[in-house]
Amino acid sequence: FYDLNPSKDSGLQKISVSADRGTWSWIESKAILSNLYLWVEDEPILAVDYTKSLVQNFPNNFYFNLLYLEALIRTGDLSVSAKFIEKMEEKIKNLTERQKEWFEPYLYYEKALLEFQKLNFEGALDLLSFTIENYSAELDIVLGNAFLLEGMSHDKLYNRSKAKESYYNCIYLDNFSGSINQAKLYLKKPYRN
């Protein structure tokens, strides 16, 4: 009747049209798609172009830089990610104290994710401790991913009881991120990839 289609695919397609063609809506649409593809749909390859465009157009937007960094790490571009982290460490110095309080745990999460990808699980756990202890952002999706990554790191180090605790902490957040489903899976069967 009103061309309303409540399907997920239809919604993603409509946001994609806005991201590609919107006069002003493209900014918010690309940010939304980046979040969805990184943390809900678990399709980081689909987030790369959106996050890259946001960073190219808004190079000083720290949050957009974090999204791009996440996409780089999760698509395996580790050498570029390491260099990008160095730039981010300089950029964070220019933020207000409140912005630092909010974004520094995100940056530590990204560093932990990179260490995990490099198979440095103990290094990842050290960085994740900072993220979890200092997390103050309203959106808890990154916190959920931090708990998930903490559990996966413990599983890789064969510390199953700590891994389960981390997975329970992730699930307890009860947000709509893909990390919740992964944590439920790894509660039943340890992460071993």
Feature map (PLM): residue ranges:
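"A position-specific structural signal for the A-helix of alpha-solenoid helical repeats
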Residues: 32, 67, 103-110, 142-149, ...
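Short coil/linker segments at helix-helix boundaries
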Residues: 1-17, 32
